[in-house]
Amino acid sequence: MLNDTITHAERELYLTLLELAQQQPSAYEWLTRLPTWLNDIKDKANYAHAPAYQASVARLPNLTVNNVDLNSDVLTIEANLSESQRKQTMALLKQLMPWRKGPFQIGGQISSRQTVDTQDNSDTNAPILIDTEWHSDWKWQRVAPHLGNLKGRRVLDVGGGSGYHGWRMAGSGADTVIIIDPSCLFYHQFMAIRHFVGSADAHTYTHGTGRYRTHYIPVPLEALPEHSQLFDTVFSMGVLYHRQSPFEHLQQLKGQLVKGGELVLETLVIEGDANTVLVPHDRYAQMNNVYFLPSVAALIGWLEKAGFTEVRCVDVAVTSTEEQRKTEWMTYHSLADFLDPNDSSKTLEGYPAPLRATLIAKK
């Protein structure tokens, strides 16, 4: 059974696409495919855990939310939590583990926001802090200063996980954010946060509140209609190295952008010249779905060959075991377990440890 949160969020998505289609006819194909996209993610035959995830979201308590801060590193939902509500909420959110992208805070005052370092989820009076595996706020801090102004723009976030960065894009003033990711778990994690955010991200008009601005479609990029050209900005962060055909991925991203639109590409790289590309023999940092790790120079060449212009690298950062780590909300192995215990500059397989670059380009 679906609760009002999921039903309403999906209705808002439909109406947003309907309004968009009246301006951009290519969006009609999205509307045609939408019922299949949304039904498939709830099909127990495809996703055995889908009914349990839906039930967890459905049982989340309705809180009186006083404020929502989409611009803070810890995405904060200010609300009063009774002890019983806190216990119920914590238990239900933990049924949606592992939480990989965040962090999020539910309860408490924004003025007294917790940090991940000061969390105490054992305190029955404290807000709930979802300390995710990734410090996704750190990535946003690296990326955000280099972005074009998102205010009023249509944004696509490819491989957006549970939606943390999508919420931050909305907080930066984007007119519409559509997050896509084929994970059933991530979809329901997003819906759990949407339950508490409510209409806080909606357009506001003199006559009242309008459409939600942040939406989620549980599909991969290749499921979208090609050459939609609907978005002013497209993000692909942490996706390219999982693609068997990186050039196909770049062309698919390009097809979603309007002419002159901005691509934000963040991916694993290695050091080297324009001819340097690592193709892991088997696993990379214990991941068996990593195919290509280019140098920054090679990646710039790929983007230019794919037809992008004004390509620039704005950030290169080593992924630390402080940025990606095991937590109360993600209790499985994490980065520290994937590095050589005697040399943290290498993975267990002997490859260079994760190094991430962010590039920005224009269509």
UniProtKB/Swiss-Prot annotation:
CDD domains: AdoMet_MTases (cd02440). It comes from the Bacteria. One of its GO terms (molecular function) is methyltransferase activity. Disulfide bonds: none annotated. It catalyses: carboxy-S-adenosyl-L-methionine + 5-hydroxyuridine(34) in tRNA = 5-carboxymethoxyuridine(34) in tRNA + S-adenosyl-L-homocysteine + H(+). Carboxy-S-adenosyl-L-methionine binds at residues 101, 134, 139, 159, 181-183, 221-222, 237, 241, 356. Its EC number is 2.5.1.-. This is tRNA U34 carboxymethyltransferase. It comes from Psychrobacter cryohalolentis (strain ATCC BAA-1226 / DSM 17306 / VKM B-2378 / K5). The lineage of its organism: Bacteria, Pseudomonadati, Pseudomonadota, Gammaproteobacteria, Moraxellales. The gene is cmoB.
